[in-house]
UniProtKB/Swiss-Prot annotation:
Catalytic function, reaction form: 5,10-methylenetetrahydromethanopterin + oxidized coenzyme F420-(gamma-L-Glu)(n) + 2 H(+) = 5,10-methenyl-5,6,7,8-tetrahydromethanopterin + reduced coenzyme F420-(gamma-L-Glu)(n)
Name by which UniProt lists this protein: F420-dependent methylenetetrahydromethanopterin dehydrogenase
SUPFAM superfamilies for the chain: F420-dependent methylenetetrahydromethanopterin dehydrogenase (MTD)
Pathway noted in the entry: One-carbon metabolism; methanogenesis from CO(2); 5,10-methylene-5,6,7,8-tetrahydromethanopterin from 5,10-methenyl-5,6,7,8-tetrahydromethanopterin (coenzyme F420 route): step 1/1
Role this protein plays: Catalyzes the reversible reduction of methenyl-H(4)MPT(+) to methylene-H(4)MPT.
Signal peptide: none
Enzyme class, spelled out: oxidoreductase
Similarity remark: Belongs to the MTD family.
EC assignment: 1.5.98.1
Compositionally biased residues, Basic and acidic residues: 259-276
Keywords from the UniProt entry: Methanogenesis, One-carbon metabolism, Oxidoreductase
Chain segments carrying region Disordered: 257-276
Amino acid sequence: MVVKIGIIRCGNIGTSPVLDLLLDERADRPNIDVCVVGSGAKMNPDEIERAVPTMLEMDRDFVIFISPNPGAPGPAKARELLSEADVPAMIIGDAPGLRVKDEIEEQGLGYIIVKADPMIGARREFLDPTEMASFNSDVIKVLAFTGAYRVVQNTIDAMIADVEAGKAPELPQVVIDTDVAVEAAGYENPYAKAKAMAAYEIATKVADIDVKGCFMVQDPDKYIPIVASAHEMLAAAAKLAVEAREIEKANDTVLRTPHGKEGETLSKTDLLAKPE
């Protein structure tokens, strides 16, 4: 059986660029068919009203909507449209989504909230395309090496397994905090685990500082250093996350969870061992 998955990508968070890739890392998984539609960097209601109906015209077993701030007007419109649709759907968002998770549940939708997927320092004096790309590369490292992406992988794979078993997919209600992420990372060395925990906690705080610099402080002489400091914090978090993985590599204890020939999740730690 081939499970048909729809992904609606509006705006960008650190999970957005790799979401579909987490499900099919070698582009050879036989049991899923993934289609992605989106609205680029923007997520205003007008863009949402074009992207979501486009996906709903397709025959999908379930749909995932991913964006920043699920409570913002655009994502709120997406939730409204998806809650009225005859297809199981879930929302993936960043920490502001915690404020509307009860609403998401009431709308009959699932959710994954990634607390350490932070807002970027979107001040024109500071953020250019190079800085934007650098920030997102740091987010990806943090979320990959702290285990957050593995939680996303496992959660969606469980939905796929439900559909394969002939059941309606169980819609998740997952908040990825430090404990949830690092547990999924499977670190064996306590120092590696501590570094991963530190990385996740720092990344979680980055959003608070960027919110201050982008919305609360109006003096450029003050808000420019504020958003720059948030990006420096994230770079430090990425460095810690890399150091955590390097410790595990030195001990040959890196946990890897590739997908098998039938789409099942395998596991291994020894580099030269076959996944089982």
